[in-house]
Amino acid sequence: MLKKKKTEVYALGEHISMSADKARRVIDQIRGRSYEETLMILELMPYRACYPILKLVYSAAANASYNMGSSETNLVISKAEVNEGTTVKKLKPRARGRSFPIKRSTCHITIVMKDISLDDEYGEMSSLKKTRWKKKSTAMTYRDMYNSGGLWDKK
């Protein structure tokens, strides 16, 4: 049985105390970009979510260089996803013996990097020209207007 060479590595950050929506705002900007471009984007973005994501990108690149021996120039973020984690629930004491709940949301972030020098399909896919779909004619003919019944009101 032939064993395929592994071309992807990942880094997983769990229970990061941040809203999943706020982390997705940053993750959507870096998905599909190269490693160097990702580092530059994350260092210049003004969001609090950038630092944990930057640490995960560094970790995924370190995993790629250690496990596969790949160079950082060949790495591309192939998949990046954010899932909601557990919610830490606490009670804050308030006046007159009442208490208000405090919900602290967490998230799980997964960064998957692909080495494009090891992946043969990536070179073939980028060299192929994207085909354009032909637009079908949407103009209605005389015969279609009366047969479909969509032209006239039925009052």
From Swiss-Prot:
Q: Which Gene Ontology CC terms are recorded? A: chloroplast; large ribosomal subunit
Do you know which Pfam families this protein is assigned to? Ribosomal_L22 (PF00237)
Highest taxon in the source lineage? Eukaryota
Task: Give the GO molecular function terms.
Answer: rRNA binding; structural constituent of ribosome
Cell compartments where the protein resides = Plastid, Chloroplast
Q: Does the keyword Lyase apply?
A: no
Give yes or no: UniProt keyword Plastid: yes
A single GO BP annotation from the record?
Answer: translation
InterPro entries, A to Z: Ribosomal_uL22 (IPR001063), Ribosomal_uL22_bac/chlpt-type (IPR005727), Ribosomal_uL22_bac/org-type (IPR047867), Ribosomal_uL22_CS (IPR018260), Ribosomal_uL22_sf (IPR036394)
Q: What does this protein do?
A: This protein binds specifically to 23S rRNA.
- Subunit comment for this entry? Part of the 50S ribosomal subunit.
Query: Would you tell me the protein name for this molecule?
Result: Large ribosomal subunit protein uL22c
- What organism does the UniProt record list as the source? Solanum lycopersicum (Tomato)
**UniProt lineage:** Eukaryota, Viridiplantae, Streptophyta, Embryophyta, Tracheophyta
Q: Which gene encodes it?
A: rpl22
